[in-house]
Regions:
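N-terminal secretory signal peptides that target proteins for export/translocation
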Residues: 1-17
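Bacterial N-terminal signal peptides
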Residues: 19-31
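Acidic, small-residue rich beta-repeat scaffolds with periodic aromatic anchors
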Residues: 31, 38-55, 69-70, 125, ...
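Short N-terminal edge-element motif at the start of the domain
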Residues: 51-112
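Structural recognition of the beta-propeller blade-terminating site
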Residues: 84, 131-134, 229
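Extracellular-facing segments of soluble proteins and assemblies that are Gly/Ser/Thr-biased and enriched
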Residues: 104-142
């Protein structure tokens, strides 16, 4: 009987230990499955508190905040977070980005229906990229696999419009002051352009670069427009842009002898 009691006590202790172990593993698994952004910015990152650095969505339910960390000689690293109106549901817009891409503050624009967000990211003197995010409930995540600006440049260099520049599209990485921007009017569906587009359907992008540093200067573009369709994911150049884009091509003056 003594041996039987010892076996039962031993089994009971083993079950308790196993239960504790399983509970611990379950908690660890749940923690690993939780979004990395749920906790919000780390202590190293400080909030930029200027009014221009915080943006509230048109429906007043989402706010964008910018945080920075001083990395010494390397510069500053920025994180861009969204929160709901109770400052909960923290979501990091740019996970994994280094100082090379997120070394400056950014500008942001919401679509009128608060379902889309564009980030205008300076990457150096005269250089800027665009990133597009889409809303799901109270959080935003990347809407495209590539930056929106890279997609716009792909469209330009593969279109007949680029042939006027007499440049090799393969050399695009060496261009100077490559700058993609938003044309004003995203917040009211570009009413000032005289177009009558569906609400929150299009984003109008301005593409720019110059010939600085080129020994034999070739034509370049300043403020060439294209439209991105948020519903279909396609780019186009509406007829209303024709006159404007015709003036976007710039030919450098001949080099003085």
């Amino acid at each position: 009987m003594g041996n039987k009691l010892e076996r039962e006590l031993h089994m009971s202790g083993w079950l308790r230990r196993s239960g504790f172990l399983l509970s611990a593993l379950l908690l660890l698994g749940l923690a690993a499955a939780a979004p990395a952004s749920a906790a919000g910015p780390g202590a190293e990152f400080k909030l930029r508190e200027d009014a221009d650095d915080v943006l509230i969505s048109p429906d007043r339910q989402i706010r964008v905040e910018q945080y920075y960390a001083d990395k010494g000689d390397a510069g500053f690293q920025y994180q861009f977070w969204t929160f709901d109106d109770k400052r909960q549901n923290a979501s990091l817009l740019n996970p994994g980005e280094s100082i090379d891409l997120a070394g400056y503050p950014a500008g942001f624009r919401f679509s009128p229906d608060s379902q889309w967000l564009v980030r205008m990211q300076k990457t150096g003197a005269g250089f800027q990229d665009l990133f597009l995010y889409r809303r799901k409930e109270m959080q935003f995540s990347s809407a495209t696999k590539k930056p929106l600006s890279e997609m716009a440049w792909d469209y330009f260099w593969n279109s007949p419009a680029s042939k006027k520049l007499h440049r090799n599209p393969k050399d695009r990485d060496s261009l100077s002051h490559v700058f993609a921007a938003l044309v004003k009017g995203m917040d009211d569906n570009y009413a000032w352009l005289g177009v009558h587009w569906p609400d929150s359907r299009y984003i109008v992008i301005s593409l720019n670069f110059d010939a600085q540093g080129e020994e034999h200067k070739l034509p370049y573009i300043r403020d060439w427009w294209c439209a991105y369709d948020l519903k279909t994911g396609a780019f186009s150049v509406p007829a209303a842009f024709a006159e404007h884009n015709a003036k976007a091509y710039t030919t450098p003056p001949p080099k003085r002898k």
